[in-house]
Amino acid sequence: MAPALLLVPAALASFILAFGTGVEFVRFTSLRPLLGGIPESGGPDARQGWLAALQDRSILAPLAWDLGLLLLFVGQHSLMAAERVKAWTSRYFGVLQRSLYVACTALALQLVMRYWEPIPKGPVLWEARAEPWATWVPLLCFVLHVISWLLIFSILLVFDYAELMGLKQVYYHVLGLGEPLALKSPRALRLFSHLRHPVCVELLTVLWVVPTLGTDRLLLAFLLTLYLGLAHGLDQQDLRYLRAQLQRKLHLLSRPQDGEAE
């Protein structure tokens, strides 16, 4: 039992790292653009147009750096999700395979956020500066971001957050209960294999709904939108399963409790 108990601290460390990275990601994608905005460097008049920006090394260099960071994150996230890599990590790390995947993803995302280069002199796709837009647009964006993050946290709980973070696998292993996914129905497993990111719409809202969409933010939003779109493969069978599960849950919630029935 001692070797099994050693797995628990490793899984908890991975979870804490992922949780801290999630908090930092909220700050990076929401609080900084909504409360801090793009760092000023001479005001909007100092920003270049799109054609001029394509010839300016001071803009292209940080843009290429940010692109490299995003490709590093996407590459790690996709490579470790491949079946061959998952089989290899499962062979050598056993029940910690999911925790390892979560920890590596968190570290890759930390690199993106820590070394991200803003481009204050770059062109912007849109910007709310004139009143009343300078007051109401940030407020509307803030409300939509709060709603989106609340929905994201709620959906993660519904989609078995402990299993997604690798905690449930270790817990079941220590208690000798086997693999958690083995207890799920084939239709649920099929859905999970197609729906790698169950919070796609909410993340897209966070990425795109900002008062100022500058060059680096446009790169971040575009590439992550493209990646999220390619990672989804839902079909009609998955949608029918989701509809049936939703109807079943609504039916259970609408049933009167024992005390109320009496």
From Swiss-Prot:
It is a multi-pass membrane protein. Coiled coil: none annotated. Disulfide bonds: none annotated. Keywords: Membrane, Nucleus, Transmembrane, Transmembrane helix. The keyword Nucleotide-binding does not apply. GO terms for cellular component: nuclear envelope; nuclear inner membrane; nuclear membrane. Its main location: nucleus. Residues 1-4, 81-97, 165-191, 235-262 are nuclear. InterPro entries: Nurim-like. Belongs to the nurim family. This is Nurim. The gene is NRM.
